């Protein structure tokens, strides 16, 4: 069976897609790159931007899930919505179908406005959304599930059942590592993670220059 042709590369700045499971430390790794002067686009931030009050994204969510996902001030009740979608895979798929196109379009727009020589684009659901076809290289951030559970409990206050539902809905870390070009083990010290990011930064600079040449 013939494989589908790869999409045309219509971007000019070298792109690295940064992905990983929830509470794996993606934000810290992204911050390390930003500290080195690398432009970072975080789709978690864009996911909030596309559902601000009055936006088409919020209107679509309300149409799909009802006004029960709104706070009294009309903004999105994110914890309530998260609880609903992680308890119902079909609801999660429906939400992703509503918001992923808006989020990824915003990422594309931001990417075209930012400089190079390379950019980091943080996309937690990189493969599920199909955005892996829109980057030149993939970096996976990973840590043991026990550490993810600990971080989730401390950061978000989720109970054990909710944490297990969230982790069950994620692509396993081993699967991400197998598909990614590069990997950051974020279970060690902050200094070790920074050192690894520094190594990757040099690699990405070289690849970006090769791509531009």
Regions found by a protein language model. Name each.
Residues 106-107, 133-134, 154-205, 212-213:
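Small-molecule kinase domains that catalyze NTP-dependent phosphoryl transfer to phosphate-bearing small molecules
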Residues 45-48, 143-146, 165-168, 190:
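Short, acidic/turn-prone active-site loops that include or flank metal/cofactor-
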Residues 58-62, 145-153, 160, 164:
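An amphipathic alpha-helix signature
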Residues 104-113, 118-154:
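ATP-dependent NMP and nucleoside kinases share a basic, alpha-helical "lid"
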Residues 45-118:
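ATP-dependent small-molecule kinase phosphotransfer cores
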Residues 21, 64, 84, 98, ...:
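Amphipathic alpha-helical segments that mediate coupling or scaffolding at interfaces
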